Amino acid sequence: MDINSLAHTKWNCKYHIVFAPKYRRKVAYGKMKQDIADIANILSMLCKRKSVEIVEAEICPDHVHMLVKIPPSLSVSSFVGYLKGKSTLMIFERHANLKYKYGNRHFWCRGYYVDTVGKNAKKIQEYIQNQLQNDLEYD
């Protein structure tokens, strides 16, 4: 078990987070598919800024799965708000044409899914790794 620490705290807080682009548009499709690495780099950089470790992540055509370790000093909702808000600004800065499809400041949909991860972390990690393949099979 991976135990992290803060000044007076030992912690192991893992969360499975799923969020989607506005209107559930297939962003990781066609021309934007080449820019998946760019979106992944943006999300990774923003996580590092908040000391959040990405255990596993997958960007599917119409949603994103992330298994992350969030320190207890940071609430899940504030982290997801930060991640979606800042990544929107950075994505629109690099891909200005998307502003017309999504509106000026709304790349991601309003909500998200979050689940705590306990002893089943390996199973969730496998699920995220296989998610892209499963999505392609159903399309």
Regions found by a protein language model. Give the residues of each.
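Charge-rich, low-complexity N-terminal segments
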Residues: 1-139
